[in-house]
């Protein structure tokens, strides 16, 4: 069953709260107690599957600090944190400037991004997901676009004035995909790709007269993102929402967490690091962590020997192993996210 809970707290208040418990006392903050102790760490609790913040983050010291604290809570609770990205993270005033830089990676090599790079290299950063740009929340009010029954109102939008439109945090679009995947498959793994869960459909499309006498359409995702730029953004730890030209359709092509995957001499180890930094794989691992803890907590005392519990857990987890991942359908992979699995129970 899908359950959604809301917490009314501003970004500034959240930052101040977590800052008071910074350091060794981070696990005493009311946010940690609400997310971890009252659910994941409580008998009968229902662990959170994902946290979504209607905030925008950049590389400022206070934002890096706040993201780091939320990453700690997410790691302890096995609960990713999804939020929006401010264009100022790339020294821009608007996402409409995204096509201007020749190389995005060079921006993050500047000295002022030292703390940002350190955050990305941390293990906890895999529990952070930053999406961008925003998407159009609704059509402008007007007789021909979005009539208001109570009174005659024409919203002043001409296509060129970007700030006059009503934009929404793309974190909501990702959250909708996560919820849809959970509803259809019971897992939050089908959240990326045009045909595999990453689609964002029926976006508002506003057309307006162009200067040359034709008709133009306002890009419902602020700016069109090329394939090359999308790959650059994913490499730098972002999840761009990419609009399909001349349509009301967009998609999250990838679902890369903020973490920069570690590189090893061993190719297999590097490949594993790449996978662990992607949200679909992380969501599957988090859900298994939730279930295993709850199952073991409930089963304590039901088995006489450690081997009995280990055998029972292995029988349970095999229900989610795809026996033929090379040939199975996307739906089967979404319902059975594992290619192989083994549970080991150790006495301490």
Where are these regions (language model features)?
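Short, hydrophobic/π-rich interface segment
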Residues: 308-326, 333-334
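Short, structured protein-protein interaction patches enriched in aromatics and acidic/basic residues
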Residues: 326-348
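Short acidic, glycine/proline-enriched loop segments that cap or flank alpha-helices
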Residues: 38-43, 58, 62, 280, ...
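Generic beta-strand/beta-sheet core signal
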Residues: 82-84, 252-255, 346
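Extended, regular secondary-structure scaffolds
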Residues: 7-24, 40-221
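Short, charged beta->alpha transition segments
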Residues: 28-41
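Long, contiguous, structured domain-core segments that constitute the functional module of a protein
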Residues: 154-312
């Amino acid at each position: 069953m899908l359950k959604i809970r809301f917490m009314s707290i501003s970004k500034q208040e959240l930052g101040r709260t977590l800052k008071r418990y910074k350091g060794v006392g981070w696990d005493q903050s009311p946010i940690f107690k609400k997310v971890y102790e009252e659910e994941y760490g409580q008998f009968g609790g229902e662990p959170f599957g994902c946290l979504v913040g209607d905030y925008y983050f950049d590389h400022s010291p206070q934002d890096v600090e706040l993201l780091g604290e939320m990453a700690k809570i997410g790691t302890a609770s096995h609960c990713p944190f999804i939020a929006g990205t401010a264009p100022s993270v790339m020294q821009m005033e608007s996402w409409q400037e995204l096509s201007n830089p020749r190389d995005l990676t060079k921006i993050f090599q500047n000295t002022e991004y030292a703390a940002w790079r350190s955050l990305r290299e941390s293990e906890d950063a895999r529990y952070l997901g930053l999406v961008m740009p925003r998407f159009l929340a609704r059509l402008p009010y007007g007789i021909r676009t979005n009539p208001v029954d109570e009174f005659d109102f024409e919203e002043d939008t001409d296509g060129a004035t970007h700030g006059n439109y009503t934009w929404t945090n793309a974190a909501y679009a990702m959250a909708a995909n996560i919820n849809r995947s959970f509803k259809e498959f019971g897992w939050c793994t089908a959240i990326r790709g045009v045909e595999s869960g990453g689609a964002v459909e029926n976006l508002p499309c506003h057309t307006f007269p162009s200067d040359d006498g034709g008709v133009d359409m306002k890009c419902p995702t602020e700016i069109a993102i090329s394939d090359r730029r999308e790959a650059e953004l994913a490499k730098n730890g972002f999840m761009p929402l990419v609009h399909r030209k001349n349509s009301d359709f967009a998609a999250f092509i990838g679902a890369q967490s903020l973490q920069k995957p570690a590189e090893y001499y061993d190719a297999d180890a590097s490949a594993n690091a790449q996978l662990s930094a992607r949200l679909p794989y992380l969501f599957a691992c988090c859900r298994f962590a939730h279930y295993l803890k709850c199952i073991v907590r409930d089963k304590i005392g039901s088995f006489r020997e450690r081997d009995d519990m280990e055998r029972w857990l292995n029988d349970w987890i095999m229900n989610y192993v795809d026996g033929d991942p090379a040939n199975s359908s996307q739906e089967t992979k979404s319902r059975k996210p594992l290619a192989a699995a083994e549970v080991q129970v150790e006495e301490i």
